[in-house]
Amino acid sequence: MPFEEAMKRLFMKKICMRCNARNPWRATKCRKCGYKGLRPKAKEPRG
């Protein structure tokens, strides 16, 4: 199902809580600043 693949591509990322860089899902530290505080990308809209 293409929709499922698109969701994985868009949301299977981690976001650095210091510099907001997008990182791979399996990352343990940020690729830009080296910070270890990563969160999964939000799947629900805010607001």
Curated annotation (Swiss-Prot):
Please provide the record's keywords in A-Z order.
Ribonucleoprotein, Ribosomal protein
Task: Provide an example Pfam family for this protein.
Answer: Ribosomal_L40e
Q: Which residues form a coiled coil?
A: none
Offer an example of a GO molecular function term for this protein: structural constituent of ribosome
An annotated GO cellular component of this protein is: ribonucleoprotein complex
Q: Which SMART domains match?
A: Ribosomal_L40e (SM01377)
Q: Which InterPro entries match?
A: Ribosomal_eL40_arc (IPR023657), Ribosomal_eL40_dom (IPR001975), Ribosomal_eL40_sf (IPR038587), Ribosomal_zn-bd (IPR011332)
**Gene Ontology terms: biological process:** translation
PANTHER family named in the record: 50S RIBOSOMAL PROTEIN L40E (PTHR39649), LARGE RIBOSOMAL SUBUNIT PROTEIN EL40 (PTHR39649:SF1)
Q: Which HAMAP family match?
A: Ribosomal_eL40
Family per similarity comment = Belongs to the eukaryotic ribosomal protein eL40 family.
Q: What is this protein called?
A: Large ribosomal subunit protein eL40
